[in-house]
């Protein structure tokens, strides 16, 4: 996928001066051997400088990993470690940092070979807090070479999201639609996250679209679309307009991303879009999202931000859906009950008009926006990509600056069930354990909008760490709590 950072982690071993430097160096070598044997060499770099209680060593290591092109850092305590210089390294490194430490290897070498990194990690964490330095520390940060190799690998998607956010520009078109206050987007928190935003009017976009009339690239783009749609190409007459619109967006990105490397788009799709452009943009949105450029509907700025984070974490296509409607009783009784271990309240339908990428649908068909067509001519509502969403594991999540301009987030893992929806749009039957309680005491209670981002797989662990790292307070980092774990607002009776 394009529009994603490549992560390269610089691994720097550190050593307390009253411990053998060789202990840290040899443990670093063992860590790198364990990592490269299991995961390869692409995403890591072994820094030859071991920091031994020295700010000069720290500067040398910093320069070395910069020269090697590292954009993420792993500080590895091979022994107790030098708490000042090791945390200064994280302070001066321009990128996400993690701290891990070496466990003792054998009962037969607990004199000269004992490193005490278990103790050193405590001092490291204290010094990080003193200096207000952000760092990712895994759940069990002290481990064997093999265990630390796994921790290092788990850091890659976390680092990719953090690096991506630091170089992201969101491009929005138009204000949110009338009567859609839920999609309000206080932008202060975007700047706090290091994200840039360029806000444009629909008129700017319409002008750019008209300037692409007759663009010589349109026929080739139409052929791409025809190949993707195959037998589902039921509205071939709208493809030239959709191709023109896709070229407009791609050209806008190149002309407007400025000094930023990555882009996400919050686009308008109603109420005037379809009457003026002559189509709905859903299919084009799905195609760009498949390229790694998330495009949200209804000018949902934090929606496309959430999609971008999920794209970074999963390195895969995501989507944005309405948490939309209940599953009818008869459908639950006939197709779910007794076949899957979910209550009726655990299930719901996630839907959007047609913005989910074709690779995430069981089959796809180019259609028209049925809801809009109730009040508009059908021909101006063409452009939706419809089909049931692929069954399998999912993570439903969202990062949001709510009406009070505070950062909040939620994460809930579940699945799309292999049950036909018998409905329209891009839609699936979702099942999330304890969804009913989560819906009431997180989504409603904490004023989240009706849009949720969907990653195709279970990525809750990495997303949770990303949200913590970027500053979401843990009391506002919500998840679907299991039975017996009451929400603060939940009635215990």
Regions from the language model: what does each represent?
Residues 57-70, 86-89, 248-258:
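Short, well-structured alpha-helical segments in soluble
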Residues 289-424:
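C-terminal catalytic subdomain
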Residues 371-493:
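Extended hydrophobic packing segments that form well-structured cores
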Residues 1-37:
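N-terminal basic/disordered segments at the start of proteins
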